[in-house]
Amino acid sequence: MEEEFLSFKNFLQEDQDKREKIIRLSREITIQSKRMIFLLHQTSSSDGFPLPKDFDRTSIFEKKIHKELESLKRELAGLNADKFSSACTHGLQEYVEAVTFKFWLQTGTLLSCKDSSFRISINFIDYVLGVCDMTGEIMRFLVTNGSKFSVQQLTQQVKFLRGLHKNCSEIEHLPSKVKSELQQKLSVMENSISKVEGICYSKILREADKRYLNLEVDTATPPEEKRLRST
């Protein structure tokens, strides 16, 4: 009996040690992913949109993330990987947010869940939750740089964000805990979309005002002055 209890105690201790190691790896992935996102905001504001396909200024963080992901894959290898998914979900969500934001800055589109850019197999739930967070980065980017975009470009991004929200809100048969987290992220996403819509509407109004003022000036200018200006 004593040997059985000792064996069970060792099993629980090994389980706890593995969980703590996975949590540490997840935290490091989160930290490096946040640094990557911060640098993406800095460089995209100065380098313009879209970023070149061979953009590599975030490679210093990506290499660190890839190293942690390799360690995480080793820890998750085996039949009990699902048991530890909650220990690494936040790190993987942040990783998805960083990678998809970079891809959006390069292409203006969404990176697929199965794309080889991800250095680890991403489950669909972590992917969706990470993409929801990524829309907040798009909003922050457009708030800072919206004046550089045309009405057509801004309208395109509004449609893109609305489409993401629609697709994410239609996902069904989720565990109650995941469903609650998704609903919270969708609520934040709605606020982000509203801000981007506001940027777009303001741009439309400013351009309409300019056209109206130009028309007013043109109408008020005497014909003689118009002829002098044209010669």
Curated annotation (Swiss-Prot):
Domain of life from the UniProt record: Eukaryota
Q: Which GO terms describe its cellular component?
A: cytoplasm; cytosol; nucleus
State the compartments where it is located: Cytoplasm; Nucleus
Q: Which GO terms describe its biological process?
A: RNA processing
Concerning InterPro entries, the annotation shows: Translin_C (IPR016069), Translin_fam (IPR002848), Translin_N (IPR016068), Translin_sf (IPR036081)
Q: Which GO terms describe its molecular function?
A: RNA binding; RNA endonuclease activity; sequence-specific DNA binding
Disulfide bond entries: none
User: What does the record note as the disruption phenotype of the gene behind this chain?
Assistant: Deletion of both tsn1 and trax results in slightly stimulated cell proliferation.
| Keyword hit for Cytoplasm | yes
Query: Where the protein is mainly located, per its record?
Result: cytoplasm
- Looking at the keywords, is Nucleus present? yes
**Which keywords does UniProt give here?**
Cytoplasm, Nucleus
Protein name, please?
Translin-associated protein X homolog
Specify the species.
Answer: Schizosaccharomyces pombe (strain 972 / ATCC 24843) (Fission yeast)
Species lineage, top-down?
Eukaryota, Fungi, Dikarya, Ascomycota, Taphrinomycotina
